[in-house]
């Protein structure tokens, strides 16, 4: 069993600084760094993946469009959508990228089935679907065995912005959400359902759960930890030189 830290961000988070925080964490983590999962909701934003094609953005309007370094095509993030950013050491977990994606899909589908929603993954396209409607999108990046980015689960949101794009590069793809099947639905209830399943399916111990009131605190925490490790290295180096 491995350890994991779960961070729940308490406010709507803009995409750009969160993306930069993921990159910083991933670039500076080491083999002994504890895995983290970040739960949050974003301010409205379209994100274009590495494989993204301009023709799939039909009309972004006043919503920002950010080209990012995850896999996949264009999608939408906004309030009422649960983001789970998975900052994991796949080598330590013994997972290939393909198995990692399938485990995410199966875990999300299993959590939705607990709400009576007949969700499942598809062999032909990443994500989780209810019939032919997409309820959860997955976009990842793996660098040196470390994953970042993650999944977007539609809970109770305004789905209208999805009509401004071809979601995930599929023309005519219909998006759905938990609220269409379970109403009312609370975000915290969804988290309480999905967290234990992630722990079980990925082999994690009971997590340390931290509620963050600002992204700045999150970034500062990682930078401080990195600085402390550098200080320890300098102390060891100096002692050897002396």
Swiss-Prot record:
The entry's substrate-binding residues are 70-77, 137-139, 150-152
Q: Which GO terms fall under molecular function for this chain's record?
A: lipoyl(octanoyl) transferase activity
| Known EC number | 2.3.1.181
**Pathway recorded for this protein:** Protein modification; protein lipoylation via endogenous pathway; protein N(6)-(lipoyl)lysine from octanoyl-[acyl-carrier-protein]: step 1/2
Where located? Cytoplasm
Catalytic residues per the record?
A: 168
Q: What is its main location?
A: cytoplasm
Looking at the UniProt record for this protein, which Gene Ontology cellular component terms does it annotate, in alphabetical order?
A: cytoplasm
GO annotation, biological process: protein modification process
Q: What does this protein do?
A: Catalyzes the transfer of endogenously produced octanoic acid from octanoyl-acyl-carrier-protein onto the lipoyl domains of lipoate-dependent enzymes. Lipoyl-ACP can also act as a substrate although octanoyl-ACP is likely to be the physiological substrate.
Q: Which family does it belong to?
A: Belongs to the LipB family.
Protein name listed in UniProt = Octanoyltransferase
* Record lineage: Bacteria, Pseudomonadati, Pseudomonadota, Gammaproteobacteria, Legionellales
């Amino acid at each position: 069993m491995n350890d994991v830290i779960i961070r729940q961000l308490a406010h709507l988070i803009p995409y750009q600084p969160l993306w930069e925080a993921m990159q910083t964490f991933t670039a500076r983590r080491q083999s002994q760094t504890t895995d983290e999962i970040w739960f949050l909701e974003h301010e409205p934003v379209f994100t274009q993946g590495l494989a993204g094609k301009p023709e799939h953005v039909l009309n972004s309007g006043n919503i920002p469009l950010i080209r990012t370094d995850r896999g996949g095509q264009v999608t939408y993030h906004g309030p009422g959508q649960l983001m789970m950013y998975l900052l994991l050491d796949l080598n330590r977990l013994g997972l290939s990228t393909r198995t990692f994606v399938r485990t995410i899909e199966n875990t999300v589908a299993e959590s939705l089935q607990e709400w009576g929603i007949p969700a499942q993954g598809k062999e032909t396209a990443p994500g989780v679907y209810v019939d032919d409607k997409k309820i959860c999108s997955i976009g990842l990046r793996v660098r040196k065995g470390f994953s970042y980015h993650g999944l977007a689960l539609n809970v109770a949101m305004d789905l209208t912005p999805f009509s401004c794009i071809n979601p995930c590069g599929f023309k005519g793809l219909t998006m759905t959400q938990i609220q269409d099947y379970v109403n009312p639905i609370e975000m915290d209830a969804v988290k309480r359902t999905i967290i234990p399943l992630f722990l079980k399916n990925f082999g994690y111990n009971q997590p340390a759960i931290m509620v963050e009131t600002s992204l700045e605190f999150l970034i500062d925490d990682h930078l401080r930890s990195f600085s402390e490790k550098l200080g320890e290295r300098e102390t060891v180096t100096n002692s050897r030189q002396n």
